[in-house]
Amino acid sequence: MDGGPSGEYPHRMETLTIYHNPRCAKSRAALAMLQAHEVPLRIIEYLKKPPTRAEIAALCEKLGSSPAEWIRKGEPEYKQMGLSDASTEEQLLDAMAKHPILIERPIVVCGHRAVLGRPPERVLEMLER
């Protein structure tokens, strides 16, 4: 189905939630794409209002991936907390809850599904299903 600023998408009226960092170029690009399609949006600046550990675990389920697949390993907090590829899922969830900068962004959620906007164009998948 073709969609766009004048096109229709199946979830046109369903509000999408974006976990957004305004200092991140990819997050800003993803947000701009969604706004261009005029979809209802709930914007969560997750560094100002961090998700709880339970919310992060729920994001894992919605993304269909483990936290190891979307934790930001290049952040200083990752090394400071002694995390590595051998860290358990529980350790990673705890770290992401304590240091939300470790959460890869942007994440767009629609109902029981979510997508990581890497590259930013991936967020448009939420409009096509």
Please provide the spans of the model-predicted regions:
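Thiol/selenol-based redox catalytic cores and closely related redox-interacting motifs
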Residues: 46-129
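Local sequence-structure signature of Cys/Sec-based thiol-disulfide redox active-site neighborhoods
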Residues: 14-32, 41-46
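Positively charged, low-complexity intrinsically disordered regions
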Residues: 12-13, 106
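Class I S-adenosyl-L-methionine
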Residues: 28-31, 35, 79, 124
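Short, positively charged and aromatic/hydrophobic N-terminal segments
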Residues: 8-9
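Extreme N-terminal basic, low-complexity initiation segments
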Residues: 2-5
